[in-house]
Amino acid sequence: MDTETEAEKQERHNNYLNELAEQDRWLPINNVARLMKNTLPATTKVSKDAKECMQECVSEFISFVTSEACDRCTSGKRKTINGEDILLSLHALGFENYAEVLKIYLAKYRQQQAIKNQMMYPKEDVEGSYTEEESRAEDADHVTQERQQPLHPVPSSASTTTSTEVSASEHVQSSSKSTHNPAQAQPRIVVQQPLGSRHSTADHL
């Protein structure tokens, strides 16, 4: 039989939420332990309480510096914390030695990111090179011109030769017609004799 009251359930739920919030404040202890072992010799071992202590210290340090950077962004009416804000916060809080090292690391990190972006998204910066939009527009114009042109275009010289040949053939045909038609070449002349001479010729016959 469940004898837990509603108030006890709510209290247990609140404790669970507090534990989650507390865990979210700290860095993962495995990551902290790995960083510690990378600095120490291979034969050195780290106890559990040392890992937990370092976990809490590192998490508090991050929260401390981030809070100072957030105040700077708020005073500057900005919503995004950048790398320069962290470096200025370290100087303001007395961590100048860390700030100088992190400044070098930030410059190298941004340089590597720029190279990575250029490899992933290459751009043609050469003068006279075509962009993708220009090449697409040129291809579209070329296709439009091909559609407007006839399938078998006739060169201008060929058309001039054809018209000359047609006119010459017409001239030859007209000349041949005039040669083979004797009526047009030599007109027929009829000579009529006088009426008296016709009768005399008939009587003679």
Swiss-Prot record:
Compartments in which it is found: Nucleus
Tell me where it mainly resides: nucleus
* Record-linked Pfam families: CBFD_NFYB_HMF
Comp. bias regions, Polar residues: 171-184
Recorded GO terms, molecular function?
Answer: DNA-binding transcription activator activity, RNA polymerase II-specific; protein heterodimerization activity; RNA polymerase II cis-regulatory region sequence-specific DNA binding
Its GO CC terms are:
CCAAT-binding factor complex
Q: Which residues bind DNA?
A: 27-33
Q: Which CDD domains match?
A: HFD_NFYB
Q: Where is this region: Disordered?
A: 126-205
What the entry lists under InterPro entries is as follows: CBFA_NFYB_domain (IPR003958), Histone-fold (IPR009072), Transc_fact_NFYB/HAP3 (IPR027113), Transcrpt_fac_NFYB/HAP3_CS (IPR003956)
| Ranges annotated as biased composition (Low complexity) | 154-170
List, as start-end ranges, the regions of compositional bias called Basic and acidic residues.
Answer: 133-145
Entry annotated with the keyword Transcription regulation: yes
Region (Important for subunit interactions), start-end ranges:
54-65
Q: What are the alphabetically sorted keywords of the record? A: Activator, DNA-binding, Nucleus, Transcription, Transcription regulation
Q: Say what the protein does.
A: Binds to the upstream activation site (UAS) of the CYC1 gene and other genes involved in mitochondrial electron transport and activates their expression. Recognizes the sequence CCAAT.
The record's subunit annotation is: Two complexes bind CCAAT; complex I, that consists of HAP2/3/5 and complex II, that consists of HAP2/3/5/4.
Q: Which family does it belong to?
A: Belongs to the NFYB/HAP3 subunit family.
Protein name in the entry: Transcriptional activator HAP3
What species is this protein from? Answer: Kluyveromyces lactis (strain ATCC 8585 / CBS 2359 / DSM 70799 / NBRC 1267 / NRRL Y-1140 / WM37) (Yeast)
In the UniProt record, what gene is named as encoding this protein?
Answer: HAP3
